Regions:
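Short, intrinsically disordered low-complexity segments
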Residues: 1-2, 40, 56-58, 217, ...
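Sec-dependent signal peptide recognition
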Residues: 2-8
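C-terminal motif of bacterial Sec signal peptides marking the signal peptidase cleavage site
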Residues: 14-16
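Bacterial signal peptide processing site
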Residues: 18-21
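Extracellular mucin-like PTS domains
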Residues: 31-74
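A surface/extracellular/periplasmic glyco- and lipid-processing/surface-interacting theme
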Residues: 65, 74-126, 133-390
Length: 390
């Protein structure tokens, strides 16, 4: 029933439901000092007013970089044995039966310069990166096989999130705020809203970060709000088995460069990490684990989904119109980077209720390498592949 309501409501509101450039709650007292370099100024132009949450807690991040191959074993309990034949639906790695029906948590994560380093996002099974105002990006991170104790910084939702969230029936969605139209539309989607307005005790503001990039989720606690009758989620795509080669049409590549506007992103194949190491604005994109150690982001799969963006009629605080990705349904070009190679193919989303499908040039579904996958909703013409000879 909720899906039927969502389909009708989505058509009327999705184009109008632009991002709100301010979180709707008054700013809490914060003694942190905001950097005044030009990059930080760009971030400030689109930052929202923070929620009134501050329990005085801060977290210490180590400057030690731990560069090591990512673990391939993910489960909710270390005491459970993985059952042969069961695979995590979004990661393709072995999983227990109990973990297969565990809650899924979607969190909206900040990626402004003031948000770095983020915490916990490296554990996500799946991350969507989308363009927001000011030429910056934000992440929609999907956690299932492993949910860190803390994740942050959490920011507000965007209209682009609705067609991404709709296929994740029964998932939890944590976020900091958005405009009234987004909130109303979110109520029609078959996800459980566990945003800061509904579950304020499961969030806190760090005092060692500038607002509004200082809202952290007690992500493991958010799982308590999941429904009891969860069903195993359907896999989003097939996964390669051990020893199975990438399709013959795949070509070796060093990686990909993406220009978002104010944010430049690169992925480079890193054999020692077993994935595509991410760089942002010319530097390694490092994130913190829950012990405060910095680690490199290196997902096993990177998908460049070339996407049309339209500018809404809503303006940010600098008078800039706010972009919305046109991904409710449709098709287009996609590059799938996996195991040091690229498959130039197509993406197809038949309707708003299903996940986007990725196929090679022959129309066959692309098999991902087991591990994490990042899907970048890149504006057309804003990405370039890097040949091995370059």
């Amino acid at each position: 029933m909720r899906r039927g309501i969502a389909l009708g409501f989505c058509a009327a509101l999705l184009a109008a439901c632009a991002a709100d450039f301010r979180d709707d709650v008054p700013e809490a007292a914060n003694n942190s000092t905001t950097t005044t370099n030009p990059t930080a100024k760009t971030a400030t132009s689109i930052n929202e007013q923070p929620d009134q949450l501050d329990d005085g807690k801060s977290r210490t991040t180590s400057t030690t970089l731990a560069v090591s191959p990512p673990t391939t074993t993910y489960q909710h309990s270390d005491n459970e044995e993985q059952e042969e034949g069961l695979l995590a639906p979004y990661r393709g790695t072995p999983i227990t039966e109990a973990s297969l029906v565990a809650p899924r948590l979607a969190l909206k994560i900040d990626n402004a310069p003031t948000a770095l380093p983020q915490e916990g996002i490296q554990e996500a099974d799946l991350v969507f990166e989308e363009l927001v105002e000011g030429g910056l990006t934000r992440f929609l991170a999907i956690f299932h096989t492993k949910v860190p104790k803390f994740v942050g910084p959490v920011r507000s939702g965007r209209s682009t999130d609705i067609p991404l969230l709709m296929p994740f029936d029964g998932a939890l969605f944590g976020w900091s705020g958005a405009n009234w139209a987004f909130r109303k539309l979110l109520n029609t989607v078959a996800v459980t809203d566990v945003g800061v307005y509904r579950k304020p005790s499961d969030y806190w503001r760090r005092t060692d970060r500038p607002a509004p990039s200082n809202l952290w989720a007690r992500s493991a606690k958010l799982l308590r709000h999941a429904p009891d009758d969860l069903s195993p989620p359907e896999p989003m795509w097939p996964f390669r088995t051990l020893g199975q080669p990438v399709v013959s049409e795949a070509q070796p590549t060093e990686g990909v460069d993406v220009t978002w506007g104010s944010t430049d992103v690169s992925f480079r194949w890193a054999t020692e990490l077993g994935g595509w190491q991410r760089f942002q604005n010319g530097e390694q994109h490092l994130v913190a684990d829950n012990e405060g150690e910095l680690v490199a982001l290196a997902p096993q799969n990177v998908v460049i989904q070339f996407t049309k963006y339209l500018l809404s009629n809503e303006l940010d605080s600098n008078g800039a119109r706010i972009p919305i990705a046109q991904i409710t349904e449709g098709k287009g070009t996609a590059w799938i980077l996996t195991d040091g190679k690229v498959i130039e193919g197509r993406w197809n989303k038949p309707n708003v209720t299903v996940h986007t499908q990725f196929a090679d040039a022959t129309g066959q579904p692309v098999s991902m390498t087991p591990g994490s996958t990042w899907v970048l909703l890149v504006p057309r013409g804003a990405a370039v592949l890097i040949d091995e000879s370059d």
